[in-house]
Amino acid sequence: MSSVTGFYIPPISFFGEGALEETADYIKNKDYKKALIVTDPGIAAIGLSGRVQKMLEERDLNVAIYDKTQPNPNIANVTAGLKVLKEQNSEIVVSIGGGSAHDNAKAIALLATNGGEIGDYEGVNQSKKAALPLFAINTTAGTASEMTRFTIISNEEKKIKMAIIDNNVTPAVAVNDPSTMFGLPPALTAATGLDALTHCIEAYVSTASNPITDACALKGIDLINESLVAAYKDGKDKKARTDMCYAEYLAGMAFNNASLGYVHALAHQLGGFYHLPHGVCNAVLLPHVQEANMQCPKAKKRLGEIALHFGASQEDPEETIKALHVLNRTMNIPRNLKELGVKTEDFEILAEHAMHDACHLTNPVQFTKEQVVAIIKKAYEY
């Protein structure tokens, strides 16, 4: 087995107020002529996609828009967006939004060059050709989908989320302009911020972690601990929003290279079955999965180390679990899976599907089906 470790991030990333204009100038200087914007109805309604469209048109690009991406984007979203791209013969894709818009755009850009159906690329590095260049403008902090090689697409017929982990879907440019996040509602700030925290923690206890991903994960936790609640309480807090831009990007650097674990493996199934918000599912599951992970000595030690980054006086994994529950309560996250509408009769199939999700492969403990069901049950009854 090779001992070589790769580290994957976009070639270019822009941060700070004014990053939108910087990105538009960069696209013009590359001499592209036709762009497809992929976004969602909410971003279209507040005028942000129109603003980016105007910037690009002022720089002599012809712009088409697909703005029907739904939360937890599905195969139909990918197909419809690809149709718009082909009609215009777009050279590049510009995604605007959170994880849903970016994931849909990645899938569209991948199919534009590789052909076939998006399900053909489920798993790790199944494509042969580079996707069309993707410029990912982020509006949440967040999924980090604007900078990762992950894309998650729902197969509604099978009630599953397909995890496509492929170097070829890595965006060409990632854009984090905190001014696009000032209007983010508190509930979405909480859900996306806790998604970023889950990325940090799962990457830190991952079997594929390394010193670089560890540094990214721990710094991400520090920034989230300092700034997430502040951003939740005051969405226009410029420092908190800026810190969260960096935090979610650091989290992305961590999990893009160390991968994830059973929190995400289970959250994907909850999203596929019940169309629940991804970040909320992660937040509810995170303490329970990590508690189960403590049977692994290395994971237990690392969870103890994380406690120091939450302000504990000593390494204690129980303090980390406690801090996660407190953070959830502070930001009004549902207490358990029961409150989210999960059904007890689905526990078995949720567990089975999670055990086939690529994210479980780097969890520090390879649970039996009975253990996965027990985790779901605990998260349901808590």
From Swiss-Prot:
Q: What is its EC number?
A: 1.1.1.1
Q: Which reaction does it catalyse?
A: a primary alcohol + NAD(+) = an aldehyde + NADH + H(+); ethanol + NAD(+) = acetaldehyde + NADH + H(+)
Q: How is its activity regulated?
A: Inhibited by EDTA.
Q: Where does Fe(2+) bind?
A: D195, H199, H264, H278
Q: How is the cofactor bound?
A: Zinc. May bind iron when zinc levels are limiting.
* A Pfam family that the UniProt record links to this protein: Fe-ADH
List the SUPFAM superfamilies hit by this protein, alphabetically: Dehydroquinate synthase-like
Main location, first listed in the record: mitochondrion
Q: Name one GO molecular function term.
A: metal ion binding
Respond yes or no to whether keyword Metal-binding is given for this record. yes
Q: Tell me its cofactors.
A: Zn(2+); Fe(2+)
**pH dependence as annotated:** Optimum pH is 8.3.
Q: Name one GO cellular component term.
A: mitochondrion
Keywords assigned by UniProt? Iron, Metal-binding, Mitochondrion, NAD, Oxidoreductase, Zinc
Query: Where does it reside?
Result: Mitochondrion
Q: Which domain of life is it from?
A: Eukaryota
Q: Read off the InterPro entries from this record.
A: ADH_Fe/GldA, ADH_Fe_C, ADH_Fe_CS, Alcohol_dehydrogenase_Fe
Q: What is known about its induction?
A: Induced by transcription factor ZAP1 in response to zinc deficiency.
Miscellaneous notes: While ADH4 is expressed at only low levels in laboratory strains, it is often highly expressed in brewing strains. Present with 125 molecules/cell in log phase SD medium.
Quaternary structure and interacting proteins, as annotated: Homodimer.
What family does the database annotate? Answer: Belongs to the iron-containing alcohol dehydrogenase family.
Q: What does this protein do?
A: Alcohol dehydrogenase specific for ethanol. Acts mainyl as a mitochondrial formaldehyde dehydrogenase and has no effect on ethanol production. Shows drastically reduced activity towards primary alcohols from 4 carbon atoms upward. Isomers of aliphatic alcohol, as well as secondary alcohols and glycerol are not used at all. The role of ADH4 in yeast metabolism is not yet known, but ADH4 is not responsible for the production of ethanol during growth on glucose nor responsible for the oxidation of ethanol to acetaldehyde.
PANTHER family of this UniProt entry?
ALCOHOL DEHYDROGENASE, ALCOHOL DEHYDROGENASE 4
Know the name of this protein? Alcohol dehydrogenase 4
